[in-house]
């Protein structure tokens, strides 16, 4: 049982943090969620929004209980996001803020790799929900922090990229290539 009425008691910054994860679910699996949260009166649909997000997580976790394949898509925005949290000593950015920034950065990385350009869509919806979209730290520092990410596999990091909207894919990116991509302007 989920009581969505509790959401009305949250301070706006905490509510917005949660919206970063909602945005993630919309981009990785169900674009209808993005449509719902784009409406000015989206809070009237919170039961449906939460239901859709829980369904996605349930389906993904049931399909990959050991987090060795499909379940990795739940980490969209988290690779760079966790790096940013680490660089900020886990005090300067909230988790939701870091994930929002990470989703935008992952979309920029996807463009550099020739994938679908969702940068503007992700940036716009994050900003509409009071979330930051730009890294407050040098990308070199984020890259160094990402070297310790759980998605690292030997000489690559499994990055979650979205293309097209509603479909997340796991992209193993060699560390050397990743360094070049994320530090190049």
Please provide the spans of the model-predicted regions:
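Residues that scaffold the ATP/ADP-binding catalytic core of kinase and kinase-like folds
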Residues: 9-10, 83, 168
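A glycine/threonine-rich phosphate-anchoring loop and its flanking beta-alpha core
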Residues: 1-38
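Anionic group-transfer/hydrolysis microenvironments
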Residues: 5, 77, 166
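Active-site segments that bind and position negatively charged phosphate/pyrophosphate groups
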Residues: 32-140
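C-terminal charged capping/lid subdomain of soluble metabolic enzymes
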Residues: 14, 20, 116-185
